[in-house]
């Protein structure tokens, strides 16, 4: 990768997408946040913050799941988050809080 290509991965295309690098066959990547689940904003909502987001599961807070000491349950939560990301075309989830 060139220095410019590396830098483009740090800054992104917009709030929610990393630029593609066609020369290397790297597709555009969508990222979303959400400490308690997936928070993907509607395409029309171009402002960061509370707005029109697609409905998604709101999982218990990180401190609550940590207090359960139930690794299997937390693993299943990760699987559910992965399924929601796949359904919404999200490649990277910036969460959950751990």
Task: Explain the meaning of each model-derived region.
Residues 1-98:
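N-terminal beta-rich core of secreted/periplasmic extracellular enzymes
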């Amino acid at each position: 990768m060139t220095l410019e290509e590396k830098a483009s991965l740090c800054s992104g295309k917009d709030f929610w997408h990393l630029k593609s690098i066609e020369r290397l066959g790297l597709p555009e990547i969508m990222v979303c946040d959400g400490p308690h689940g997936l928070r993907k904003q509607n395409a029309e909502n171009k402002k960061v913050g509370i707005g029109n987001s697609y409905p998604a599961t709101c999982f218990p807070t990180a401190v609550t799941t940590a207090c359960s000491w139930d690794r299997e349950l937390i693993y299943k939560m990760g699987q559910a988050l992965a399924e929601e990301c796949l359904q919404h075309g999200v490649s990277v989830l910036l969460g959950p809080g751990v």
